[in-house]
Amino acid sequence: MSTTLRELNGFSAEPASLTASTLVLIDYQNTYTTGVMELEGWAPALDAAADLLARARAAGTPVIHVINDGGPGTPYDIRAEIGQIHPRVAPRDGEAVVVKTAPNSFVDTTLGELVDAAGNYALIIAGFMTHMCVTFTAEGAFLRGNSATVIADACATRPLRVLDTDVSAPRLHASALATIADLYAVVVPTIAALAD
């Protein structure tokens, strides 16, 4: 097995702890549970995200929700039910909601300011889709100097086709997590790996 870039740079392999982190939940929107953008494995991933959110709330972890706005009439229309956050992980009063338009949740949003205001260097990241907004937000966190942990089973994606090759959702999910784990963040299989 290859040596990761994290190992070469001497970065910690220790997952984040809930009490010393901020939780960033990305794009758990209804659009990923039905219709043209439905993801494979969204239901168990959403269950894992709900468990993660409940545990974070119990630990007093700051929570930031991120949603993508594709504009009126799109599958990401946050003014319509399709673009809203799924009820299983809906924000509570006092939990920030960041609206983004790019895969990197830090681009042209207040996420960085909210993360800094929460006062935690470490982030815990989970969301939809693994290969897109989760990957690029983990990269964004890394580039701004945060230490991130990504929860694999709370993420999901969809199958794609490229260069006459079908890429299954599990393969794409695993490939995205490998990219993240090579440099941008610690990747853990489940929330069981997180200390309180």
Can you name each region flagged by the protein language model?
Residues G35-P44, I124-T130:
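Short, glycine-rich nucleotide/cofactor-binding loops
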Residues Q29-T34:
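Short acidic, Gly/Ser-rich segments with clustered Asp/Glu that frequently serve as metal-coordination loops
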Residues L25-I26, T61-N68, I151:
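Short beta-strand segments at enzyme active-site cores
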Residues V36, P72-T74:
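Glycine-rich, proline-tolerant flexible connector loops at the mouths of alpha/beta enzymes
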